[in-house]
Amino acid sequence: MIKLYFKQAFHLLKENKLLSSISIIGTALAIAMIMVIVITLRATIAPFAPESYRDRMLIFRYAGFQYKTNENWQSNGPVSYKTAKACFKEMAAPEAVTITSSFSETMLAAKPAGEKVSCSVLQVDDDFWKVFKFDFLSGYPFDKATFDAGATKAVISEDIARQLFGTSDVVGKTFLLNHSAYMICGVVRPVSKLARYAYAQIWIPLSSTDAFTASWGEYGIMGMVSVYILAKSQDDFPAIRMEAERLRDRYMEGYPDYELLYRDQPDTYFVAAQRYSANNPPAVKQAVRQYIICLLYTSDAADEARS
């Protein structure tokens, strides 16, 4: 019976080769487009190492800072470490809270008297390794004592280790990062660039650089750090947001003439991916609309090709 179906199909294809070719190519392109959309969505929101807990993550990257009596005066951007620590680190509801530099930075790494290698560096705190799940090939992440001391230790990816030393067995060795000496405490498997908030090739303590105290604007409220919150469950999201508001209000009691605007943050992972600037709302509806239109269009195109 199955052989008969195949014979009938081949017979129909031979009757009109041009229309059959158009139908097959159109259907294939439609399926390919749907696969691209699904893969894009999966890369945007589906958990994968080291962002293994995307579904339980809340993200705070930008804030607004303004006079209460003059809303026309406003600063927008990332906050300082001082602000992030006061407003988020004392939270009781989450499983973990990490503060990192807002963006990875390109630096030059080298062995003493060796060739320089350009690499992506992210500055993080000790809780970073609780929020993001890295595959350590050797060694370990730096701990709270290391972070509090501002020690110059680093976790590096396997590919950078091989570029610098010719081997991945480098725990305990020292290298130069923008001319500052760092000791390697751990080596991890290379991270995909699709892991937008965890990606780097070298991770160092935020406290080992001036980013720890860097700020701009009035009173050191604004700076260059982001906050990533790991909830115990998605059900805890409302409680975490309420606690964030309470800590923000307590912090701003010291600055009675100003407001710190969260603009509906912290965001879920998908919403954060649609927030492109500090002072504009995330384009969530537009993103969802685009995905739906693309799916409907490709579905219609496939139907037309088959007909």
Task: Set out the residue ranges of the language-model regions.
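Short, conserved clusters of charged catalytic residues that mark active-site
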Residues: 4-5, 19, 39, 43, ...
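A short amphipathic helical element positioned immediately N-terminal to and/or at the very start
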Residues: 5-14
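Short, strongly hydrophobic transmembrane alpha-helices
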Residues: 15-44
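Membrane-proximal extracellular/periplasmic loop immediately following the first transmembrane helix
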Residues: 37-108, 115, 222-226, 234
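Short acidic/polar micro-motifs at solvent-exposed secondary-structure junctions
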Residues: 63-77, 86, 98-127, 141-153, ...
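Mid-to-C-terminal secondary-structure elements
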Residues: 122-142, 152-284
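N-terminal membrane-entry
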Residues: 282-296
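Conserved small/polar residues in nucleotide/adenosyl-binding loops
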Residues: 297-305
